[in-house]
């Protein structure tokens, strides 16, 4: 069952806007993961990486409520990061182009799976879960503040 907060956010901004937002968030995630890889996996501030991963997870969950983390054979360290970047870049290219397709859903599931593997490699699963919750709550707060008591936009 999809989190009602995600549905609220999607309804507020619309699918077309959130598809563009996904491309943007994937770009930011790719930059952070790229820095992590270039740093030889010694990046001291994992919070930046996890924050960008959370943004991607949130928008994927909005656009693809039926997406689940598909089981993946567990590759090693840098390989997970590389595969995550590859799948995310492919998803961004699809989202920026043609309308929704089943292949797009498959890539969304792969991205979620590789995010899960990557955050486990970072040993930061709780940080990701907390970041997702905080970011969703913050967005809902913005929506509520922008609407009057009658539910209309201000």
Tell me the role of every PLM-derived stretch.
Residues 1-154:
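Flexible "arm" and connector segments at domain edges
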């Amino acid at each position: 069952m999809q989190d009602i907060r995600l549905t609220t956010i999607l309804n507020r901004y619309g699918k077309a806007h959130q598809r563009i937002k996904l491309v943007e968030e994937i770009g930011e995630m790719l930059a952070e993961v790229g820095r992590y890889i270039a740093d030889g996996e010694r990046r001291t501030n994992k919070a930046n990486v996890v924050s960008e991963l959370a943004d991607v997870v949130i928008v994927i969950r909005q656009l693809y409520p039926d997406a689940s983390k598909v089981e993946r054979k567990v590759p090693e360290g840098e390989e997970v990061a590389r595969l995550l970047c590859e799948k995310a870049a492919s998803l961004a290219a699809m989202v920026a182009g043609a309308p929704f397709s089943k292949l797009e859903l498959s890539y969304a599931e792969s991205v979620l799976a590789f995010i899960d593997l990557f955050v486990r490699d970072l040993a930061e699963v709780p940080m990701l879960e907390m970041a997702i919750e905080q970011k969703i709550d913050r967005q809902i707060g913005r929506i509520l503040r922008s609407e009057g008591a009658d539910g209309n936009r201000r």
